[in-house]
Amino acid sequence: MRKVTGFVLCTSLILGGCSFMHKDQTKDIPKTVSVKDYDGQYIGGHKKRNEVFLKKHKDEAIKKYKDYVKDTFGYDCKINLVKSYTNASGFSEKSKTDGLVVVGTVNYDVPFQFRLIFVESGNGVAITTFTPGHVNETSAAVAAMMYKRYEPEIERARLKFKSEVEKNGYYTMNEKLQKKQEFNGVTKQFLNFNTDSIDDLDKFKKEFKPVMHLKGDAFNQQLQNLINKYPQIQKNMESEFIAYYDKGENRETVANYVWNLQKTTNDTMKLYPGNKSIIFYKDKVSASQLDEHKRLQSDSQEISISGGENN
């Protein structure tokens, strides 16, 4: 198998927002926005250095992103977000490094969200990863494969959750913003879904990539063989059922609602394997800063509870 070259291992913290922006460069950026209508236009760094870095390397990063997707998964993709960031290990300018994040949707049977990070290398940019075998990256495709396998059951749970929360006035982020999430896996309205992969890129392309392109019974059988060999791809499936509540709503009231919501959605969430969680965020989020889950930072702590648990 042909190897994709130019990878750089990254051990520093990637900053999702704009921690180093000068005030005069951010005066037009709103402090908080609503996920109902915000399109994500301010996500990323906005210092002069970020703008220069983005302009210089954007086209190359997009090309390398598309080449990686085609080589690793065998599909085309659509670019949703290209942002610049500044990473700092100290306070001096020399301690700061710049990079790009590219987020897109891979045109698979179950379209999936895919993120790559790039850093400067020579006169260009190279892909950087926290895992030598690209387990973080290939997990996006494995999630889509598992979603394809359990799609009727997952969709039933998602639509049940959607129905329950919408009739009580809760909602999800708009689709344009949803597609700009820095997430590896399947993103749907009210749901983020991912799982584990194997930490070996060459082995992934040899064993998983051919199965991705199968249909029907052939797909199910070959995927089951992979599950038997790598049980973590089923065992560690994660379904996050996500909703937002109005910024003026009482947090304790929402927390009580979430507790009761677990009971009404429990039966459908138990229909397929993996871990499920219900997460509510206050709809007063940063226009640029991301939280530890790579979602726009809410000004209130999340409300979360396990879902699909046996009584």
What are these model-predicted stretches?
Residues 14-17:
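C-terminal motif of bacterial Sec signal peptides marking the signal peptidase cleavage site
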Residues 130-216:
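Surface-exposed beta-loop interaction hotspot
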Residues 19-27:
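Bacterial lipoprotein signal-peptidase II cleavage site
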Residues 40, 45, 53, 270-311:
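Hydrophilic extracytoplasmic domains
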Residues 42-85, 257-266:
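Short, non-transmembrane alpha-helical segments in secretory-pathway proteins
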Residues 111-137, 270-275:
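A short, surface-exposed beta-strand/turn
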